[in-house]
Amino acid sequence: MTWQGWAEIALTLSLAVAIGWPLGVFLSRVWNGEKTFLDPVMRPVEGLFYKACGVDPSKSQSWHAYALALLAFNLIGFVFVYAVLRLQGVLPLNPQGFPGLSGHLAFNTAISFITNTNWQSYAGETTMSTLSQMLVLTVQNFVSAATGATVAAALARAFVANRGEGVGNFWADLVRTTLYLLLPLAFVVAVVLAALGLPQTLAAGVTAHTLEGAEQKISLYAVASQEAIKMLGINGGGIFNANSAHPFENPTPLTNLITAISINTLGWAAFFAFGRTVLAKKDVRALVIAAFVLLFAGAVGVYATETQAPPAQVAAQVDTSANMEGKEVRFGAPATAAWVAMTTGASNGSVNGKHSSLMPLGGGIAMFLMQLGEILPGGIGSGVAIMVVMALLSVFVAGLMVGRTPEYLGKKVEAREIQFSILAVVIIPLSMLGFSGIAAVLPEALKGLMHSGPHGLSEILYAYVSGTANNGSAFAGLTANAPWWNVTLGIAMAMGRFMPIVAVLAIAGSLVTKPKLAPTAGTLPTDGGLFIGLLIGVILILGGLQFFPAMALGPIVEHFQALDAVAALR
C-alpha cells in the first residue's frame, strides 16, 4: 500500500459525490417539473411522447396505479427484448451473422437488462449482433435506469405530501428522467470517450495480420455510446466479455477514472435530488455520509487485501508486492480496488479486473457490499429508496428503545411501513441463501462450477447475491450459460428488482395519506452523528450478519485454507 494508492481511491470516490451534488439539484428540478435549461429542446419532444401515448402528465396516480404502470412497462420491455434476441438471426444489422439466442439464454438476458442487472451468461462480441446491442440492450440501459429513478421520485413526493392521494405519474417521471438527464449526459460522456479512443462504428470488425502471418478478426461495435450509458445508468453490461478490462472499453487510466466516477455519480445524484425534493437536505446528508463511510471502508478493505502478496507466492519466495492476478497492469491495484467497491456498492457490476482472482477476503468484501442491499449508493433512485427503508427501520428500532411512535421526515412510521420495509430487505437473503442451498447439492447446477471446495461455494453465493441485488458481476469460474443457471438467475433478478420496488411504492402510498408533522422535543434527530451510527449498525446487522454462516463456508474458509497450505510448505 502506498500513499499514492490511498489518494487515488479517495479522489475517485470523492469526485463521484462532488459531481453528483449539482446533478442531484438538476434531477430534483426534473422530478418536480421545474424549468431547466434544456426546456427549449426537450419540452416539445416530451410533449410528443405524451400525445402519442395518450398520457396526461399532470394526472397523479395512486401507488397501485403507479406500480401497475411500472410493471406493465417492464413486462412489455421483456417481451420485446426476448423476441429480438430469439429472432436475431433473421433481423437486419447483423453483419457478424450471429444466430438467435436459445430460449433460456434469451430469457435470462431479457430479464437481466430490464431489471438493470446486466448479468451476462454470454460473450457479447461472439453472441450479440449490432442490432441487438443497439435496439434492445442499449435502450434498456436507459429505461431500466429511469425506472429506478421513478421509484425514488414517488417516495419523495409521499414525504412532502400532507394528507395527499397520489404519488405522481409514472409515465411523466420515466420520460422526463430519460430525456432531461440520461440522454444528454450519456451523449456528452460518449463523445468524450470516443475522443479518448473508444471505437464508435457500425462495422462488424477489422482483420489484422499477426506477426506469425495469421489473420485475426477483431470485433468492433458502437462502443463509446453504449459504454457511456452502461456506466451512467449503473447498468454494467459490457459489449466485450472482458468488460471494462478490455482495451476497447477502457483503454487508458484517464478513461478508467472517467468511467469509474460515472458508476456512482447518478446514484449520489439521486440522494441529493431526494433531499432537495423532501426539503430535508441535512437528513439526507446523513444518509450520504453513512453510505460513503461504508463504501470507503469497503474500498480500503479490498485495497488492503490486494496489496498483500498471495500466500502461495510467499511460500515460493516470489518477490511481489501485490496480488496482480486478474488485474490490468495499466490500472494497478488501487484503481482496481476502487472499482471493485464502487461497482458492488452500486448496482453496476462492470469490472476492470476479475473478481474471481481477488484474494479470498477481497472477493468476500465484494460480496458483502452487495449483501448490504446495493445502497452505496446503489442504482439511480433504487439505492436511495432502499436507504430510506433502512432509515425507517432505524427510527423504528430507536422508537422501541424509548417507547415512542417513530417519525421520519415529518411522517409517523407505523406497522404498515415496517412490514413493507422488512419485505424490501428480506429478498436478498431469501433468494441468495435459498437458491444457493439448492444449487450446492443439485448435480445439474454443480456442472457449471470450475472449482470445488470453498471457492466453488463462493462462485454460487456470488452469482445469486449479484443477481438478486441487480448487480451483474460474477466470479468467472462459473459457466452460467445453462438452463438451470439462466432460469434461476432470471427469477432471482426479477425478485430482487420488482419485489422491493412494489414494497417501496406501498410505503409511499401509506405515507402520502398521512399528515405532515412538525418536529417536537421527542422527535429523534435524523441528521446527526448518533443517527448515522445507528443507521450503519442497522445496515450491517440486516445486510451482513444474516449472511455470515454462508460466508464463513466460502471466502473465509478459503482464506484460512490458503494460509494453512502455505504453512505446510514451510
From Swiss-Prot:
InterPro entries membership: KdpA (IPR004623)
Q: Which residues form a coiled coil?
A: none
> Where does the protein principally reside?
membrane
Q: Where, per UniProt, does this protein localize?
A: Cell inner membrane
Q: Which of UniProt's keywords are assigned here?
A: Cell inner membrane, Cell membrane, Ion transport, Membrane, Potassium, Potassium transport, Transmembrane, Transmembrane helix, Transport
Give the protein's function. Answer: Part of the high-affinity ATP-driven potassium transport (or Kdp) system, which catalyzes the hydrolysis of ATP coupled with the electrogenic transport of potassium into the cytoplasm. This subunit binds the periplasmic potassium ions and delivers the ions to the membrane domain of KdpB through an intramembrane tunnel.
**Which named protein is this?**
Potassium-transporting ATPase potassium-binding subunit
